[in-house]
Amino acid sequence: ATAPPMKTIKIGTGDEELTLGGETVLFRHEKTFVNKTRYAVELCTCMDDATVDAKLAEIPKVDYDRIGERMYAEIVYVNCDAEATADKYVALVQKAAALGRTLILGCSDPEIAKAALEVCKDSKPVLNGANASNYEAMNAVATAAGVVLGVSGKDLNELYDTTAAIEKLGNKNLVLDTTGADVKETFANTVQVRRAALKDQDRTFGYPSIVNLAKIAGGDYHLQAGLAAMFTMKYGSIVVMERMTYAEALPLYGLRQNVFTDPQKPMRVEPGIYPMNGGDENSLVVTTVDFALTYFLVSGELERSGVPLNLVINDAGGL
């Protein structure tokens, strides 16, 4: 009875461990959002080797800091199309795993999923592929490997029933794939699942959500970027895209950082003296306030100057 209405789920390991869910409010101003939306780039067995290699080379290029936070595509979504063999899928999973990012295995064939998990289960990926027709077998595969299971349904009723059935099997280490047939259905699904969990206290829907934009806006990169912004604000725990370039990343990660900043606490750095460029007690002193954005802008310029100095941060209450 004291557990939060939305379960907190951890995926990945080490530095790449990601925390999803755990939200308690529908709107940021009511308290705060807890765990930020994570972005995934999709690979598919339907792609040729050259396309896969090009995407794998592009993913690490978007990796930068903004106000002390690392901005990069945290997840690689590896999709298994209907024509793929186990060998082909496993080979693609191994290629993706070499990046060192957290993986989501988009696979609804229990045998292929089992083979893929043999090469990556230690990195704690998500196995996204349980549905009304295969949930028992997929649950067994995910449970044996000790990984999070992704659940989907043709509509919310089927998603609810399948999730409830998996819970009865003893597995509550789940994420819900709320992707529908189109943008409208996907948005409605994602919002209704979150409202049911937080407003109606329905714990069957109290799990993080996956929204796959590659399915509902495939090939339209501009639309995917816009939808990623929408689902960042409206309840996508993981948003899957076909690519992540700087053009998409700069506005998207800036938006995410603002949405998932605690409105009760100003973004601030610790007041104090920060030597820069080898500054000592005889060096120039520069002072500014403790608002985080001001600090990172000022400190960046000072570092680039190469002048030894001490940056003194005053306590201005984060303003």
What are these regions (language model features)?
Residues 1-9:
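Non-heme iron-sulfur electron-transfer modules
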